[in-house]
Amino acid sequence: MTDRNPRTAEASGLYTYSSRPRAVACQRRRHRDSILQPVEEPMSYGNIMYDRRVIRGNTYALPTGQVPGQPDPLELQRQQQARRRALARKRAQEQLKPRTPEPVEGRKHVDIQTELYLEEIADRIVEVDMECQTDAFLDRPPTPLFIPAKTGKDVATQILGGELFDFDLEVKPMLEVLVGKTIEQSLLEVMEEEELANLRARQYAYEEIRNVELAEVQRLEEQERRHREEKERRKKQQWEIVHKRNETLQKISALIFARQYLANLLPSVFDKLRNSGFFYDPIERDIEVGFLPWLMNEVEKSMEHSMVGRTVLDMLIRDVVERRINDYEHKEAMPPGQKTNVINGPNTVTDPSVTTLHTQKPVLDRVSSQPAPSQERKPVEEGGHLMAE
């Protein structure tokens, strides 16, 4: 409230102001305001299936909160949506921003400087070398002695001799007390040192006894370990002896049984194997496998050569006989006056060797076409009969 009295204002020389008192409005609404004044805003609806306050699953299980250190998935989704909206808004602003039209065909846009002062743009930046020398490190000055500030006042008092007490009279009891306390403290320290020495000696004796007992315990443990190892070794050795004895007995019994079983079986088996050809004489087998096949091949080759020679000879004989037969038939068909000229003429050749030589080549050509020598002997025999006639 403003002070309206000018005299008071002039007397004080200050400007004062005080506000009018008013009641403070209640910030909290009453629960019946909504009933008295219904809200006209539309009610917002939500799906409780996506409400995080609704517990799903087993109702007996304790609700587990968010694991510390892991981000909230809803918060992450909200941040991603906000980031997406910001990117979309930025793209829309870039599209709405006025741009330079596209250059004409054959030209291109070039960036130029539009500032007031031109600046040279080079590939290499201008570099300038500068040096600066710092001072050497100075020794740290000594720390000044800390003197606390005075908190009281200095007052001086003068005491004359004999005003407080008589030195000879009052110092003697004090001195006796000090000397007595000093002697008593000295005695206590000496007794403490003796007690510590006794404790140290007793501790040393106990340590000696403990070391002896530990050595004895180690000896007994080592002895027990050796006894246990010896026992295990003896048991293992005895088990090996028993195992070997049982194995030997089994082998001996198996050997005796095998000998008894094979006593009558071996001769028959050996006889069958010998008859089957499993046991053979190496020399005889070498002759049968190596020598006899070679011998048979050589014999077959020799017989083949001899049969080829016989076949060639039979064919030669047959050709000669056929030629003779043809000559005699021709002679019988001729008149009687010409028989002598034909047979004994100057151009007549009666030597069979010449005929053989002339007909040898065609006969050799026909050897390969003849199937067998037995078939060639038949016409030869027929020719022989004709010659005999």
Swiss-Prot record:
The UniProt entry, under InterPro entries, shows: Radial_spoke_3 (IPR009290)
Keyword Mitochondrion in record:
no
- Provide the Gene Ontology terms for cellular component: 9+2 motile cilium; axoneme; extracellular region; radial spoke head; radial spoke head 1; radial spoke head 3; sperm flagellum
- Location of the region described as Disordered in the Swiss-Prot/TrEMBL record: 63-106, 332-389
- Modified positions (Phosphothreonine) are 143
Family, similarity comment: Belongs to the flagellar radial spoke RSP3 family.
Q: In its UniProt entry, what is this protein called?
A: Radial spoke head protein 3 homolog B
What start-end ranges are recorded for coiled-coil regions in this protein? Answer: 206-242
Listed A to Z, the keywords are:
Cell projection, Cilium, Coiled coil, Cytoplasm, Cytoskeleton, Flagellum, Phosphoprotein
Q: Which residues cross the membrane?
A: none
Tissue-level expression reads: Expressed in ependymal cells (at protein level).
Q: Does the keyword rRNA processing apply?
A: no
Query: Which residue windows does the record flag with biased composition (Basic and acidic residues)?
Result: 91-106, 375-389
List all Basic residues biased stretches: 81-90
- Biological process according to GO: epithelial cilium movement involved in extracellular fluid movement; flagellated sperm motility; mating
Q: Where in the cell is it found?
A: Cytoplasm, Cytoskeleton, Cilium axoneme; Cytoplasm, Cytoskeleton, Flagellum axoneme
Subunit-level organization: Component of the axonemal radial spoke 1 (RS1) and 2 (RS2) complexes, at least composed of spoke head proteins RSPH1, RSPH3B, RSPH9 and the cilia-specific component RSPH4A or sperm-specific component RSPH6A, spoke stalk proteins RSPH14, DNAJB13, DYDC1, ROPN1L and NME5, and the RS1 complex-specific anchor protein IQUB. Interacts with IQUB. Interacts with phosphorylated MAPK1. Interacts with MEK1. Interacts with PKA regulatory subunits PRKAR1A and PRKAR1B. Interacts with RSPH1. Interacts with RSPH4A. Interacts with RSPH6A. Interacts with RSPH9. Interacts with LRRC23.
Composition bias type Polar residues, residue spans:
338-359
Q: What is the lineage of its organism?
A: Eukaryota, Metazoa, Chordata, Craniata, Vertebrata
Native source species: Mus musculus (Mouse)
Task: Name the job this protein performs.
Answer: Functions as part of axonemal radial spoke complexes that play an important part in the motility of sperm and cilia. Functions as a protein kinase A-anchoring protein that scaffolds the cAMP-dependent protein kinase holoenzyme. May serve as a point of convergence for MAPK and PKA signaling in cilia.
